[in-house]
């Protein structure tokens, strides 16, 4: 499992509210992702994760890792956006 709990990105393009171990942030079981003015919500469904924006389902994933590796924003997997933020590329 890729541990994102240590990250809390906040810049002009991307805002992450990162999961805790029990998938709960301030009592909410959702993770909000804002990217270039678009808002996304990552919602856990058991071990699975569903991504939706403005009421439209954008993807269903088997795990958070599956989501990071396979969900694409602007043609890039989500993990690439995370790496860009982490390493400043």
Each language-model region and where it sits:
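Mixed-charge, Lys/Arg-enriched low-complexity segments
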Residues: 1-9, 57-89
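Negatively charged, low-complexity tracts enriched in Asp/Glu with abundant Ser/Thr
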Residues: 1-32
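Acidic, low-complexity, intrinsically disordered interaction modules
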Residues: 27-33, 39-67
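Short glycine-rich, low-complexity/disordered patches
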Residues: 25-38, 79-89
